[in-house]
Amino acid sequence: MASILKVDKIRVTGLDSDSISFDNSGNITFNKTVTGDNAAMVKLLETDVTSSVSELVINGTYINETYETYFISLSGAGSADGYRVHCQFYTSATQSGNGTIASGSNHGHGTHSMQDTGTHNSDTDTECRLTNSTIGNSTGEGYLLWGYLLGANRTDVPVQFMGQQTTFYTNGSQEACNFVGGMVTPGTYGAYYCRGIRLYHNSGTIETAKLKLYGIK
């Protein structure tokens, strides 16, 4: 037989206010801060850039064996007129450590504009290009992107970062784009763990940016 606990308030011993209270309809009010990581998405990192930096690096402190999939959002603006957003991956043959960026042409990418026939792709590159067209540096010009980092702990297929972005050309026009970037040479890097990602502009510096990283359960 099931037991039933009937209460209308829960208070921790020694406190002078309730932590949880219930009304006559069964609605719950939390009067104290709720913490923990039971949500499907767990925020791991939030970074605000307010002065020039050359790159944003998320290392093995955040991208490690804890999660298979990660969600990244990034918005920003650059110093150069006519830049693109690129990335590289830190990979490791072992689960521990921060990994290294592979030398040689072991990155691949593809971008496709939603507004015209513009595409760009390569499966033998030293970096991944995430934005299709060049981005301006006038007031209001910049980019916003989001993507899923997939397969961080798989050892049968290389890690990939895929998502969507919107940018503003050097003339202020908007472009929406799909992108995929990741490790290639699957015979080698399919067995490697991803232990970080480096985000940067192919010219100039990152002047302002907001970066968020979530682990996906």
Where does each model-flagged region fall?
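Surface-exposed molecular-recognition determinants
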Residues: 2-217
